[in-house]
Swiss-Prot record:
CDD domains: RuBisCO_large_I. HAMAP family: RuBisCO_L_type1. The keyword Endoplasmic reticulum does not apply. Residues 1-2 form a propeptide. InterPro entries: RuBisCO (IPR033966), RuBisCo_large_chain_AS (IPR020878), RuBisCO_lsu_C (IPR000685), RuBisCO_lsu_C_sf (IPR036376), RuBisCO_lsu_fd_N (IPR017443), RuBisCO_lsu_N_sf (IPR036422), RuBisCO_lsuI (IPR020888). This is Ribulose bisphosphate carboxylase large chain. Heterohexadecamer of 8 large chains and 8 small chains; disulfide-linked. The disulfide link is formed within the large subunit homodimers. GO terms for cellular component: chloroplast.
Length: 477
């Protein structure tokens, strides 16, 4: 044996495999204000102790690998490793635990959601020792969140740009989502905006297809916006979807929108990716564009209760990456969303400081310091009868978006927009007068419909429409 080999052996390196919990389970650890904290829902394989499972998550999402390596001795694992510092049993679930993991801040690149997720969820979810794994929540310390720009503008700046206060904003997704020519698409936009909506929207999969190329759509929508603004005296917008196959093409589309003078563009942030989204958010702040975010593909990641990632984590990541609006479910419409859980991540989007509240699914106190807020968008299977509940649930700082609930009106798009605007104004007035929207909502809509034939027709069409299915993802009891 050579002297060099003898020296390496003498420093204590021992090849082989050892339990993760010996290094990465540290129940005595006191978390630091600068740590990123994660709450994982862990379902170990039979025979795997929860401490070993939690430690494996901490190891595989930070410095660990499956065997001891001699290069561990070339750095300070104690400084850089993730630590599973607490484990609790999930009441009512067999062999399921919440494992809390603390990550040192130096593990992450500044201002990069991409790097943060690559570390925390990039590899560990396929680990064989775990039957299932879900990231329930993250605590982002101010020392990390301050390295992000965040939303291009935020709630107050958007209201100032639009000169609209004291009520939710109204939107509409143009339908059919695919197949319209650019000119007919622009016509639908114009009818909705002149009827009283604040915004219309490209659907998430409207990019640049053979039936309607993006530049043609942008031009006809800009024409519709200017015409509706001239007729109504209100500032209008259409979410022009800039999502594209490359970042360069995406920015080119945003540049065109800016040159047309429109107020807002749109991005599909999960399918487009966080790097592209952050790049677009920076461009939007630099060039005065609002940024609407669609969460297409989110349910692939967040719908199952025991595996994946909860939407509250995706919402926090979006606030850091940048967006002025994001779709957040409706509670009352056709898409998944339990009320208390939805309100929990709505507050995480809008508020500066959110206290830990397990009854709403919030595992950690979150302090965003001065990062601007994001407006939640309620969209999916909603109509005029839902207006009181939506106004009561989401409050003023929200966008209520009616696609079929506008374009499905028996008299056309503009009357559909009128019906929604009248219903909203009636609900806001009733609320301001002290009436209980939750209890008196239907009566408020009926009273308003006496003075609006458009609303009366909408009420008749959708009086029997309900989406009453039990949510898949519920809060733990």
């Amino acid at each position: 044996m050579s002297p060099q080999t003898e020296t390496k052996a003498s420093v204590g390196f021992k090849a082989g495999v050892k339990d993760y919990k010996l290094t990465y389970y540290t129940p005595d650890y006191e978390t630091k204000d600068t740590d990123i904290l994660a709450a994982f829902r862990v379902t170990p394989q039979p025979g795997v102790p929860p401490e070993e499972a939690g430690a494996a998550v901490a190891a595989e999402s930070s410095t660990g690998t499956w065997t001891t390596v001699w290069t561990d001795g070339l750095t300070s694992l104690d400084r850089y490793k993730g630590r599973c510092y607490h484990i609790e049993t999930v009441v009512g679930e067999e062999n399921q635990y919440i494992a809390y993991v603390a990550y040192p801040l130096d593990l992450f690149e500044e201002g990069s959601v991409t790097n943060m997720f690559t570390s925390i969820v990039g590899n560990v979810f396929g680990f064989k020792a775990l039957r299932a794994l879900r990231l329930e929540d993250l605590r982002i310390p101010p020392s990390y969140s301050k390295t992000f720009q965040g939303p291009p503008h935020g709630i107050q700046v958007e209201r100032d740009k639009l000169n609209k206060y004291g009520r939710p904003l109204l939107g509409c997704t143009i339908k059919p989502k695919l197949g319209l020519s650019a000119k007919n698409y622009g016509r639908a936009v114009y009818e909705c905006l002149r009827g009283g909506l604040d915004f219309t929207k490209d659907d998430e999969n409207v990019n640049s297809q053979p039936f309607m190329r993006w530049r043609d759509r942008f031009l006809f929508c800009a024409e519709a916006i200017y015409k509706a603004q001239a007729e109504t005296g209100e500032i209008k917008g259409h979410y022009l979807n800039a999502t594209a196959g490359t970042c360069e093409e995406m920015i080119k589309r945003a540049v065109c929108a800016r040159e047309l003078g429109v107020p807002i563009v749109m991005h599909d942030y999960l399918t487009g990716g966080f790097t592209a989204n952050t790049s677009l958010a920076h461009y939007c702040r630099d060039n005065g564009l609002l940024l609407h975010i669609h969460r297409a593909m989110h349910a692939v990641i967040d719908r199952q209760k025991n595996h994946g990632m909860h939407f509250r984590v995706l919402a926090k990541a979006l606030r850091m990456s940048g967006g002025d609006h994001i779709h957040a479910g409706t509670v009352v419409g056709k898409l998944e969303g339990e009320r208390e859980m939805t309100l929990g991540f709505v507050d995480l989007l809008r508020d500066d400081f959110i206290e830990k509240d397990r009854s709403r699914g919030i595992f950690f106190t979150q302090d965003w310091v001065s990062m601007p807020g994001v407006i939640p968008v309620a969209s999916g299977g909603i109509h005029v009868w839902h207006m009181p509940a939506l106004t009561e649930i989401f409050g003023d700082d929200s966008v209520l978006q009616f696609g079929g609930g506008t374009l499905g009106h028996p008299w056309g798009n503009a009357p559909g927009a009128v019906a929604n605007r009248v219903a909203l104004e009636a609900c806001v007035q009733a609320r301001n007068e002290g009436r209980d929207l939750a209890r008196e909502g239907n009566e408020i809509i009926r009273e308003a419909s006496k003075w609006s034939p458009e609303l009366a027709a909408a009420c008749e069409v959708w009086k029997e429409i309900k989406f009453e299915f039990d949510p898949v993802d519920k809060l733990d009891k």
